[in-house]
Structure formats: structure tokens, C-alpha cells
């Protein structure tokens, strides 16, 4: 079986790399509820061993690295090609637009409310966001404004050059964010996690917003409590855009299995989703939400040759990548020990033989 290269729309490889120690924790600039001035690429460590594992085990050829969700506005995300490089600049996806990470709900109000500052409630979340957008609109309309890195990013969102990726769980909050986006004049490209997206599939379809979701992870906090296994299937039936994401260094190695689980959950309810549509959840739809669908995400003439050859049905738990090409270059071959990228960090470490 051959598929387009797998794309993970939500990853923290590099900004929360392995080994997971405090010294490497660089994903949340949790010093202010709005930090649009920070860029995830300035935290990415290209030697994170997770990149090679995502390629070899998951067939990941492109991925979006996002700031964390402590802040209402977490900063710019960056799209990378999953290629070995000494620098983050050497991994950046040519021509990919920047993303902008936002978060609603529990995380910002918990982080800043616990410090006795705003926001400490959901209404505080919206108020801080709206005030920040109003200031950005003034900046965007002032040709003589002094350069401001944060407002420059927000201006990019307002002009459509930077795509919004909004961490949000509850249906009512996603609807409020869409109201705010209309008020302020920007578009949400995707809601991430979105465990209650199934409740508003029609609204998401009408607003052309993708839902980047897990197959079966929910219930770990109150705002994620009302998740269902059929989230993806209900969204697909409604004609909304579905993306399966990882947000995890392990799940990124098996997004094909996650997509298959979501497909199976729908089938148990009588929603039969074709395999080709399911593969799009981890290829074309992700590319669309990231603004790179004209360059990758499907196997078409003129697109980047990001390709995975599987040793069986890619929607089977028993299947693994056999070969992976990025931009036409063979980067992984399961039958050739020399064709397996290894992080320089792992060389010379105990257990080195496991990765060579």
C-alpha cells in the first residue's frame, strides 16, 4: 500500500523534546496570558530523538510544532519537514504559512487565576482576547506604528497570512471563539482537541473550520469530559473537516492506527467511512488546515514527493512503514539499517545499538 506522507497537525517535538526534563521544557512562555511575540521555532531542538521515531514508525513527513496551551495567545507555530538537520531552519517547510496558537477554557484561567491575575474565568478569557485584538487592529491600521513583534503576528492573522489553531474542548466555547473571530475579522483554521466538536458539526462545516482531534482520548479533565468515540465519524457525516492529531511523542508514531480506531467507532454505529477518506484525516485534511495542501497531502503531479510505502493495509494495527520518502529522497528503509535517521544526541549513549 502507498499513501501520501503522514502529516501531524499538532506536535510538540523539539519544544518539549526527549529526554523530558525541565531544562528542555520550552513550549509555554507562561509569563503573560498573551504572548503573540514568541515563535515556536525558536524553541525547537532539531536533535529531538522523537523526529526519527515519528518518521520510521509513523511515516510522518511533515508536522506542525506549536507552543503550548498555558496562554490565551501562545505564539507562532512552525511547519517542518521531517528531515535530519543541524538547525531548525534546515527543517522548515518551504513556503508554509505560520500558524498562531490560541487556547480557550481551563488552561489559561487556571494558570493565571492561580496567580491572582486575569483571566481567572472563561469570561475573563474572552475579555483579554478581545482587548488584545482591538489593540492589534489599531496597530494594523496605523502605518506609522512602531514595530511590535506581538502585534505584527496578530496583524498577520488579521490579513490571513497566519492561520489560527485554537486549542478548545467544549462546543459552547468553540462557538464563542467563532463569534469573536467574526467580530475581530479573522478566521479560525482549526480547533484542536475539540472533544465536543460532534455537537456543532454543522457550525464547523458552515465556517470551514477543521477539527483536529484524538480518536479516543477524553475525560481527563472537566472540559474534556463529554467526549465520545464517534466524534470523527459524526463530523465526517456532517460534512465537516476531520483531522486526527497526536499532541504526543508516542501517538505521532501511530497516527494511522488512531485514524483506524476512529473509523471503527463510526462503523459500529453504521457510519461506514471509506478508507480513502480516513487516510485524508492524516494527510490532505491536515495539509489543508495548515495551508500546505497545494504542496503536499496527496499524491498528485507537481506536488512534493512525500510518500509512505507500507508493509500492509495502513489502517491495520499490524502494519508499519516499509519505506518513507520526503521530497523524493528515501529517508527510511526498514530493510536497510543504514537508511534510518538517528539523532546525534543518541550517538554514544547507553543503548546506542538500538537506534543504529
Model-flagged regions — what are they?
Residues 13-16, 46, 68-73, 171-175, ...:
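Active-site environment of divalent metal-dependent phosphoester hydrolases
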Residues 91-92, 200-202, 220-228, 320, ...:
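Short, charged, surface-exposed secondary-structure boundary motifs
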Residues 50-192, 320, 326, 352-354:
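Polyanionic/metal-chelating signatures
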Residues 18-19, 25-38, 163, 183, ...:
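His/Asp/Glu-enriched, well-ordered alpha-helical/loop segment
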Residues 1-67, 71:
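Metal-associated gating/positioning segment near the N- to mid-region
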Amino acid at each position: 500500500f502507498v499513501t501520501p506522507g503522514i502529516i501531524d497537525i499538532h506536535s510538540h517535538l523539539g519544544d518539549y523534546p526527549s529526554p523530558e526534563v525541565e531544562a528542555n521544557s520550552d513550549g509555554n512562555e507562561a509569563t503573560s496570558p498573551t504572548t503573540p511575540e514568541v515563535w515556536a521555532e525558536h524553541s525547537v531542538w532539531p536533535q529531538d530523538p522523537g523526529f526519527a521515531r515519528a518518521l520510521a514508525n509513523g511515516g510522518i513527513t511533515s508536522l506542525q510544532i506549536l507552543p503550548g496551551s498555558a496562554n490565551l495567545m501562545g505564539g507562532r507555530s512552525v511547519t517542518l519537514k521531517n528531515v535530519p538537520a543541524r538547525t531548525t531552519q534546515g527543517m522548515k517547510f518551504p513556503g508554509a504559512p505560520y500558524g498562531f496558537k490560541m487556547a480557550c477554557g481551563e488552561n489559561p484561567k487556571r494558570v493565571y487565576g492561580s496567580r491572582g491575575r486575569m483571566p481567572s474565568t472563561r469570561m475573563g478569557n474572552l475579555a483579554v482576547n478581545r482587548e488584545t485584538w482591538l489593540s492589534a487592529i489599531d496597530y494594523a491600521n496605523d502605518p506609522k506604528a512602531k514595530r511590535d513583534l506581538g502585534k505584527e503576528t496578530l496583524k498577520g492573522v488579521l490579513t490571513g497570512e497566519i492561520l489560527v489553531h485554537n486549542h478548545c474542548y467544549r462546543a459552547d466555547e468553540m462557538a464563542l471563539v467563532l463569534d469573536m473571530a467574526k467580530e475581530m475579522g479573522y478566521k479560525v483554521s482549526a480547533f484542536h482537541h475539540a472533544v465536543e466538536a460532534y455537537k456543532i458539526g454543522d457550525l464547523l462545516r458552515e465556517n470551514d473550520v477543521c477539527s483536529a482531534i484524538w480518536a479516543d482520548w477524553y475525560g481527563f479533565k472537566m472540559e474534556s469530559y463529554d467526549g465520545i468515540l464517534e466524534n470523527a465519524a459524526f463530523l465526517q457525516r456532517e460534512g465537516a473537516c476531520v483531522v486526527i492529531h497526536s499532541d504526543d511523542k508516542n501517538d505521532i508514531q501511530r497516527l494511522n492506527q488512531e485514524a483506524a480506531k476512529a473509523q471503527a467507532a463510526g462503523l459500529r454505529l453504521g457510519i461506514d467511512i471509506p478508507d480513502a477518506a480516513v487516510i485524508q484525516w492524516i494527510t490532505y485534511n491536515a495539509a489543508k488546515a495548515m495551508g500546505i495542501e497545494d504542496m503536499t497531502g496527496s499524491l498528485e503531479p507537481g506536488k512534493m514527493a512525500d510518500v509512505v510505502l507500507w508493509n500492509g493495509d495502513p489502517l491495520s494495527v499490524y502494519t508499519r512503514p516499509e519505506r518513507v520518502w520526503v521530497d523524493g529522497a528515501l529517508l527510511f528503509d526498514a530493510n536497510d539499517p543504514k537508511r534510518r535517521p538517528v539523532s546525534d544526541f543518541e550517538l554514544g549513549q547507553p543503548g546506542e545499538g538500538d537506534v543504529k
